[in-house]
Structures are given as structure tokens and as C-alpha cells.
């Protein structure tokens, strides 16, 4: 960890705890800052705040009192999930207090070079693929960021022989100033998190912050399957390295079933350890990064062939009497489910879909679900999903919850079929998050096997 003194004896407010806020508070305290933590959860229900208080860090819980900002803070570090419309943040900005996320802190102290990965879909899988390939090549890829390990925590233990492989959300990237990865990846850009950003253009601008400090000596890996992303290529100082499954590019690309990097075959597409056209894109992004880091083709091929996926992202769960179960609970939008289905023969798929009703119809999904063996539909959005199934001519049954849906899907499947949980909806109508939903699917599959 780099020892820096820019926060020494400076008053810093950490707004919001969770993993990233807790890590930021401890780091700032270690760097000599005078830290105050403010979290909305009551103290008695807030183990993180209790621990920080025991460590001598000032905590204010149970709300966000605006008068707290009457103190002269030099900096605010906010939890990424707290929107900039929050009154505390608005007041801080009005007073000229810089507002950062802990990703910026991680950059400032990191001795390790940083590879940053952002995008709408595929971030976690691509981040994990890159980390595993670099580690296999002896470059020790340390996963951090939005993938579940606070970047500022991992940066404290990283040496210059490691590589920080950071998954970065738009929320995190809104709060960076000096952040400067040596390689950045944008997997794709789709309209999402508009409730947070207000406009798609604002969401894209937040993602684009990843390259703000990059120079021609740095590499920006972009998905040229998308015209929007391709158009952005002319707006960066970084050296652009494209990847595409649709055209031959000066980077990583798919041609005749083979994955190439600048004219050289790296591996066959069907050798990737996880199915789906989206995973071909993820693999191409990984290949581009790996080749920029001088990883040999054999190491890339062996690692991506053995790659088992990421939990809740088209994760193979089990095989029961010839029926394979896949957990794709992370597919919380139509595009993600479309990509999941692209990896299978529809006639052998029983799809479990439905969840939180956000008011959108599923007409875009009709071509992708046409020809499915059956569907099991559940959740608030069930009526809308059923309308799409009717248009596609797919028979369906309804379920009360994930356990019920999994059992019914298994009853409808026969040897050689696939039961695919890929809801195309968020989980919040029934479950706290997509992880809980996916875990219940996994647990039910285990019960069916007993």
C-alpha cells in the first residue's frame, strides 16, 4: 500500500456503510484522517457501526442529519448506492466538498496496476475470467470492486507484483476524479439504472468516466458489436482495442467458430467452459486483456476451457437423470435472458421466468422464447410474461415461488432437457436480491436429487 498524506488530519465524512463504506472508514482512519461515519440504520441494528465505534471512529446512525455538514469537512466518501439526489450529497456539493467513492481511494493507495471492467451486462463474468487468466499466467489477478470485495480493502494488501482486477458500476464511476487504470474494458452499454441516473445519457457518461485519465499508453477494450460503443472509440485519448463477434477487428474477434487476436487463433468458441453467445463476447474481452498483458495462448485456452462460470450467472447447478439445471438468476432484464437462451436448443429448454413488475411488456423476448419446450411463470410480472408466451405459442404453467417453479420445471422436463432459471426480471417482488432467488433454486435442485 502506498503511504499517502493527503488525508492526514483532514475531516472526512463517510456516508453510508455496507462493505465499501466500512472499508473506506478504516482506510481513512489508517491514513490519519479525522473520520465521521454516517449511516441510516439504527445503531442497535448496525454491527458495522458498532465495530467502528469500538475502534475509535466517530459514528452517527439512525438518519442523515443535514446539520452534520455544518462541520467543515474536507471530503465526503459516499456509498455507491446512495444517489446524488440525496440531500446530504446535494448540500456537500453546494458547499464545495468533493464527493468520492472508495474506488478513488483504492486507486490512490494501490501499488498494483489496475484493470477496470464496466458495462451493463457481463461485468462479473468478464472480471472473473480476466482474474483467473492472469493468475494462471503468474500475474496474480486480485478481484475487487462491485464483485463483492471492497476495492480499498484489496488495494491495501496488493503489491506491485499483483494486478487489481476491478469490476466497476456506474454508481462507483460517478465518484472518481484521478482514477487511472492501465487497461479498461466496457463490455456493453444498455439502458439500465435509469431510476438512479435519470437519463440513459447520464448513465453512459458515468460509465465513460472509466477512461477520463487514460492516455495513449493505456488500453481501452471496447465491444464493437454495439454502434454506440464503437462511436465512443473516437472520443478517448486511450489506445482502443476492439472485440467483436460480428466483424474482423484489430483486436479480438470471432471468425468461423474460432477466437482470434489480431490474426492469430487463440481457441475455438466451443471450447469456452460456459455456454451462450454473451460468454463468447466475455471471452473475447478477456483474450484482448490477456494478450495486452502478454499471456500465452495455451494459458488462455486452458483457463477459459476450465472456466465454470460465476454463481447466479448461467451457472451449471446439477444433472438429475439427464436433466441439466442452470441458475441464471442474475438475468434481471430481457437482454440478459436473450443471451442466456442463445446458448441452448430451445426445443429442449424449460424456462423459468418472471419477477418484479416494472411495467414493461416482453414483446422483445417473443422471438427468443419461440420454440421453447415449456415455460414456468411466476411473480408480479406473470401476466405480462404470459402474454409474451402466448404470442410465441409456448405452453406454460404458473408457480407460486422459485421452489414451486423448480419442481414444476423438472416435472415438465425429460432426459436431455435443460431447466433454465433466467427470469428477465428483478427479484424484489419476492426476494431480497437475485442471490437469494438463485440460492433457493440451487437448494431446490439439491432436494430433487435426494
Curated annotation (Swiss-Prot):
Pfam families documented for this protein: Mur_ligase_C, Mur_ligase_M, MurD-like_N
Record's subcellular location: Cytoplasm
Molecular function as annotated in GO: ATP binding; UDP-N-acetylmuramoylalanine-D-glutamate ligase activity
Binding site for ATP: 119-125
One cellular component (GO) term of this entry: cytoplasm
Keyword NAD: no
Sequence similarity: Belongs to the MurCDEF family.
Role: Cell wall formation. Catalyzes the addition of glutamate to the nucleotide precursor UDP-N-acetylmuramoyl-L-alanine (UMA).
Record-given protein name: UDP-N-acetylmuramoylalanine--D-glutamate ligase
